[in-house]
Amino acid sequence: MTKLGIIGAMDVEVETLLSEMEQVASTKKAGSTFHEGVLMGLPVVLVQCGVGKVNAALCVQILCDCFGVTHLVNTGIAGSLCAELDIGDLVVSRDAMYHDFDCTHFGYPFGKVPGMDVIAFPADDTLLGCAFAAAEAVNPGHTRVGRVASGDQFVADPAVKEKIVANTRGLCTEMEGAAIAQTAYRNSVPFVILRAISDKADDSAEMDYPTFEKIAAHRCAEVACKLAKHCLLYTSDAADE
């Protein structure tokens, strides 16, 4: 049976999803509250992981070890790295990599974590398809599929943005996705990252982010609800085959 883990970083990203859940039982582990219940007919576990890569990875491991999730979705907001991506647009991850991991001194490619067999951690094709369909249902014509670039930094500087684009060729930047992707990858749990654009990751970001944070986060939560429904339909169809 499919059991979907949904991870958000902040209150604004998870409050809408929690309000849509039924049969909710909440458990606190390692400082985070895990809400187990049903979303759009699908068993889910929803957690607010907090900001940053360590918090995100910790919650993924708990979801895998303590709740037995079979699939993972990271929902939230991000800064645009692409001129064609405007505030309110949506990004579905093809893969995710770190923009602040650099072992090039030792001969590794930029972003490569020693011991890993990939630089960018690939999303699951089925989840990607479900996420894209859900995003297009909410905001037709405003969804891009591509790379999510992650680091422990809120990007509000055009020079930093330009460097991240050069190093990663990412579509958007945020602070949790690649850590979630790496932890899911190491646990062989399929994942996808879903991001709504809240700012342009440049010198306008400090002004745009507070204004559009809630709008972007609620849009992403709406897509996550539809994604759960798509996953339920997909697993039901697979069971019938």
Protein language model regions, located:
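Regulatory input/activation interfaces that engage signals or partners
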Residues: 191, 196-233
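Mid-sequence, gly/pro-rich, charge-dense loop/helix-turn segments that line enzyme active sites
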Residues: 81-168
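A C-terminal functional module that forms or caps the active site or interfaces directly
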Residues: 155-193, 198
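Alpha-helix C-terminal capping segments
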Residues: 62-66, 84-85, 182-190
